[in-house]
């Protein structure tokens, strides 16, 4: 019973708070969920500035790659990657999540540069395992058709999206990762792009979403607006494949 009435009660409480505090600074507890790697790299570094601007807001941030139900799990805001099609949520786009294939210059010097997806069978592969247990599929476009590569025997398998890039920088093999995570490594020369003519970047997006309510709590609006403005100014989140082309091996 409580699970059914909790969202309605929360909406009622937020409406009262919004009406009462419309002229006051945002305050109260704000519960946020985000992916582990994205949270470490992009969300947490922005928190000091947010709290200086909104000292009355107390943040609780959960960083993991679990599947999250915003309402059921009691979160106010989610910052997540994927395709969001829930009409009960307000969705605000942060950036496109283009995927790329990378390896370190040292690895490529030792093992050579893969020229086609078929070459990957002769390379060390750094794979990502989802919480479901499945290994992330690598997608390519070959002669206009979608082709999937599945690493049956990866050299290294990790469950953290940020760590696959660190492993690639360490020269442990070829991996697939989001361009925004690869961007600083590409600029610094720690990674090179491979298989660019065949790369399928995907169609996923990083979004901020929160419950669709008539009265959005001031603390929610303040946090969402602050994050959108701050992340808009982060170059790595808006780098394109065209921008990345000079970093190809």
Per-segment meaning from a language model:
Residues 10-33:
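Short helix-loop hinge/linker segments at domain boundaries
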């Amino acid at each position: 019973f409580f699970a059914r009435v909790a969202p309605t009660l929360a909406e009622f409480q937020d409406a009262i708070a919004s009406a009462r505090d419309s002229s006051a600074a945002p305050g109260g507890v704000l519960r946020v969920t985000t992916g582990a790697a994205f949270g470490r790299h992009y969300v947490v570094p922005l928190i000091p500035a947010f709290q200086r601007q909104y000292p009355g807001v107390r943040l609780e941030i959960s960083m993991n790659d679990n599947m999250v139900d915003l309402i059921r799990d009691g979160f106010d805001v989610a910052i997540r990657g994927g395709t969001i099609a829930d009409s009960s949520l307000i969705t605000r786009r942060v950036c496109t999540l283009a995927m790329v294939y990378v390896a370190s210059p040292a690895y490529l010097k030792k093992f050579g540069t893969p020229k086609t997806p078929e070459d990957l069978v002769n390379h060390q592969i750094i794979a990502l395992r989802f919480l479901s247990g499945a290994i992330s599929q690598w997608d390519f476009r070959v002669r206009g058709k979608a082709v999937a590569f599945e690493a049956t025997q990866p050299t290294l398998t990790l469950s953290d999206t940020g760590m696959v890039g660190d492993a690639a920088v360490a020269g442990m093999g070829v991996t697939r990762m989001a361009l925004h995570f690869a961007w600083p490594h590409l600029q610094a020369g720690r990674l090179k792009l491979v298989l660019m003519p065949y790369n399928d970047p995907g169609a996923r997006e990083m979004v901020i979403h929160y419950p669709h309510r008539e009265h959005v709590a001031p603390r929610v609006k303040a946090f969402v607006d602050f994050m959108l403005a701050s992340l808009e100014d982060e170059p790595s989140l808006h780098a394109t494949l065209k921008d990345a082309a000079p970093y190809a091996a």
